[in-house]
């Protein structure tokens, strides 16, 4: 039986809260897992504190280090990422190194860095 993701999401969307609760319980029993949120591990001593802080970082900055040789492609990428106008994006690229995006999720930041690198720029995730 082929059950694709879209059909599954449609089925979930039509379920009531009670039905969803029963589904969660059935999944827990079937696979031996728990839907309870995991508690954050307690912070270690002073030596482990720095490593724990680095792992917990949730907001990232995308930094344009260098525009590279293909400035036009980089300006287009910056416009796509930021939604800036042409002049603002050009000024940002010309003023490198500069933050392109600040305080964004890791997945979004990685996607932005990838787009800038593909356009020929040198970009960093901080």
UniProtKB/Swiss-Prot annotation:
Tell me a GO biological process for this protein: translation
Keyword terms, alphabetized: Ribonucleoprotein, Ribosomal protein
Q: Name one Pfam family in it.
A: Ribosomal_L12_N
Enumerate the CDD domains for this protein. Answer: Ribosomal_L7_L12
Any one of the GO CC terms = cytosolic large ribosomal subunit
InterPro entries, per this entry?
A: Ribosomal_bL12, Ribosomal_bL12_C, Ribosomal_bL12_C/ClpS-like, Ribosomal_bL12_oligo, Ribosomal_bL12_oligo_N_sf
Alphabetized GO MF terms: mRNA binding; structural constituent of ribosome
Which NCBIfam families has this protein been placed in? L12 (TIGR00855)
User: How does this polypeptide assemble, per the annotation?
Assistant: Homodimer. Part of the ribosomal stalk of the 50S ribosomal subunit. Forms a multimeric L10(L12)X complex, where L10 forms an elongated spine to which 2 to 4 L12 dimers bind in a sequential fashion. Binds GTP-bound translation factors.
- Function description: Forms part of the ribosomal stalk which helps the ribosome interact with GTP-bound translation factors. Is thus essential for accurate translation.
- Sequence similarity: Belongs to the bacterial ribosomal protein bL12 family.
Q: Under which name does UniProt file this protein?
A: Large ribosomal subunit protein bL12
Gene transcribed to yield this protein = rplL
């Amino acid at each position: 039986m082929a059950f694709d993701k879209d059909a599954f999401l449609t089925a979930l969307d039509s379920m009531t809260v009670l039905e969803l609760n029963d589904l969660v319980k059935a999944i827990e029993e079937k696979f031996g897992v728990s839907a309870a949120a995991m508690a954050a591990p307690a912070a270690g001593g002073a030596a482990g504190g720095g490593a724990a802080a680095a792992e917990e970082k949730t907001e990232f900055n995308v930094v344009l280090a260098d525009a590279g040789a293909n400035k036009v492609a980089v300006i287009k990428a910056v416009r796509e990422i930021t939604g800036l106008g042409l002049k603002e994006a050009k000024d940002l690229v010309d003023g490198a190194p500069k933050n392109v995006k600040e305080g964004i999720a890791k997945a979004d930041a990685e996607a932005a860095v990838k787009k800038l690198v593909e356009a020929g720029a040198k970009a960093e995730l901080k």
